[in-house]
């Protein structure tokens, strides 16, 4: 059997050793080694650093993975992630995120919950048709998955949406913990087992060959009951068994043991893929996910930036980079097919679209993740980067400097704008490209240098806006310490008519928001307001995020509890003027809320949401 070993030049000890464990894989190129030399600045010797490129993704079969070390990444950003308060996405935004997930190379995209609303149904269908039939490298095509409760209506809706993809999947679930069965479902164990078995069989009977089943709240379920119900759904045709720690209750050792015991005690488990879905209520979602993988799970459910219900989900970037960084050494050789150089761009896209800011000290993608301020650390970094960096920032798509030498400025042309945005992960053309370019030119007239972060902020503000009901034309404010601030706002409605209003307030932003309210005449409550400087300097672009809640209507029904939830809507704005940035964000949130109201009125159907 072939093997590859790289030794340390001084100690002679192995740095990396690779020996294929599966004889069927000996003819495939899984590693492409690229030795490079990293030198100490004040030393006379060099240390060879061996890096490897992305491994080949094994051919997809629903219930089997040819390479036992390969781990599938299931991205549920568009389903569970969107359930974060204020993270409501438009159909176009969901499509853009799905495209970016495909660039990442995720194996499965859970595109939504089609039965929750007609809007979600159409969004999942659009993603299935476009992203699920895309042309990618090495014959890769992502699986497109739709969530469904264990009932025929939900399953029919899910199949209606995902069947257009080359690789469609239905993900159905029912609760299995005593507290859920007794108080929420009001069903006996036998009834729950029969419902799960019959609905998995029904999903297979309508033509779906890839069916995932989740026993909701598995982390608090009786293990013996889990083995039984999982065995029954395997017999009914399930291809993936997802084990959700729905309330983030377990600790890593406990969750790893649960996965191991399921593999050891569930009849027929050798014919399916075991999956994990870990919530972050105790801050253990990444650790639990890795523990599950070490115990035998070969599908990991994650979200970009870890967004999701309550405290969020296991973070895609953390899980993937942990496997990349420690997979060979301590995680049994586990690896994924993720192109990690798209991680940072994916994070920024989801941050901009969802309006959920990434905390500066967030692992992997936070603003401080690769920043060194301590004098001792800085000294070490100057001598050798490996002293305080276990991950190269370039591995996630973060370039320390503009290596191309191309600087964006007011003299740059539109022909440079398109490839630059493509480099940043955005495919835009036509009117969207023109609008972005002229917005960029406007900023470039006032700002000497336009950074990548500036472009991303302008992209989010100009392109990732909901279908406009109202459009900001002008805003003029007067403020100071001598009296109330005043604001005059001009908005354009969908028919092109101008509306002007004036108001006073305790500050320029408050006055401007009150002027907008006088025009729109829709009562809302401002729940959150935040502003960040995109870059450094007095000429930095200000990025604003607001979260609002409508006073009338705008509710959704929780699919599991039946509870009425007051839906919130976020809006983002970007401009060098903080008042204009603030008003853009507020108008964007209002547009999203009013578009949602029109859609619900058109379909005359309440929306549902689901948690697993």
UniProtKB/Swiss-Prot annotation:
Organism: Solanum pennellii
Enzyme class: transferase
Function: Catalyzes the condensation of the acetyl group of acetyl-CoA with 3-methyl-2-oxobutanoate (2-oxoisovalerate) to form 3-carboxy-3-hydroxy-4-methylpentanoate (2-isopropylmalate).
This protein's name: 2-isopropylmalate synthase B
HAMAP family: LeuA_type1
Record GO biological process: L-leucine biosynthetic process
Domain (Pyruvate carboxyltransferase) ranges: 71-344
PANTHER family xrefs: 2-ISOPROPYLMALATE SYNTHASE 1, CHLOROPLASTIC-RELATED, HOMOCITRATE SYNTHASE-RELATED
Gene Ontology molecular function: any one: metal ion binding
NCBIfam families: leuA_bact, PRK00915.1-3
Catalyzed chemical reaction(s): 3-methyl-2-oxobutanoate + acetyl-CoA + H2O = (2S)-2-isopropylmalate + CoA + H(+)
InterPro entries documented for this protein: 2-IPM_HCS-like (IPR050073), 2-isopropylmalate_synth_dimer (IPR013709), AIPM/Hcit_synth_CS (IPR002034), Aldolase_TIM (IPR013785), LeuA/HCS_post-cat (IPR054691), LeuA_allosteric_dom_sf (IPR036230), LeuA_bact_synth (IPR005671), PYR_CT (IPR000891)
Pfam families per UniProt: HCS_D2, HMGL-like, LeuA_dimer
Keyword tRNA-binding assigned: no
